[in-house]
């Protein structure tokens, strides 16, 4: 049996670190594509159509575009995406009316395919229903992914906690 002892694995030509192993044995992959985006607004609003999450907490590899709200897969692989949002009645961010439905869709713009959907119907009192979902999707390099909202709106305000979109590469196919 052989033992390979390394602390860092780098690209031979450019010295780009692909992986490190820390003193506790944890594997770190600093070049793995990931993003965490949110909607930064000046006040309460309701949004529909393609949602532009215009600010990021992290964007490793810069594959998420905060101007368009779109993520472009840099490589073919399995990706996990997460969406957090609440339904809203209108562009003013009002609570969704009773007996009303709203949905948010993870959409592959390149293949014109709906990949996942969060759906809510308000039964009874007016409220802000949860539209959150998580999905693992196989993507090809250069697939463009976005969140679309239909039927009504999603709620956003001046905080960065109500409307979130994130994703990361799990592994290559």
Please annotate each region the language model reported.
Residues 2-7, 11-16, 24-173:
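Extracellular jelly-roll beta-sandwich "head" domains, especially the C-terminal globular C1q domain
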């Amino acid at each position: 049996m052989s033992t390979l002892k390394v602390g860092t694995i780098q690209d031979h030509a450019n010295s780009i670190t692909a992986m490190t192993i820390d003193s506790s044995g944890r594997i770190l992959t600093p070049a793995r594509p990931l993003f965490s985006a949110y909607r930064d607004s000046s006040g309460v609003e309701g949004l529909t159509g393609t949602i532009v999450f215009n600010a990021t907490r992290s964007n490793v590899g810069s594959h998420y575009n905060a101007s368009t709200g779109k993520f472009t897969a840099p490589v073919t692989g399995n990706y996990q995406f997460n969406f957090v949002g609440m339904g809203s009645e209108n562009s003013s961010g009002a609570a969704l009316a009773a007996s009303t439905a709203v949905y948010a869709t993870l959409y592959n713009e390149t293949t014109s395919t709906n990949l996942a959907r969060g759906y809510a119907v308000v039964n009874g009192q007016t409220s802000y229903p949860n539209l959150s979902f998580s999905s693992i999707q196989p993507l090809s390099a250069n697939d463009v992914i976005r969140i679309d909202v239909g039927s009504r709106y999603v709620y956003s305000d001046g905080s960065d906690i109500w409307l979130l979109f994130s994703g990361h590469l799990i592994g290559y196919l």
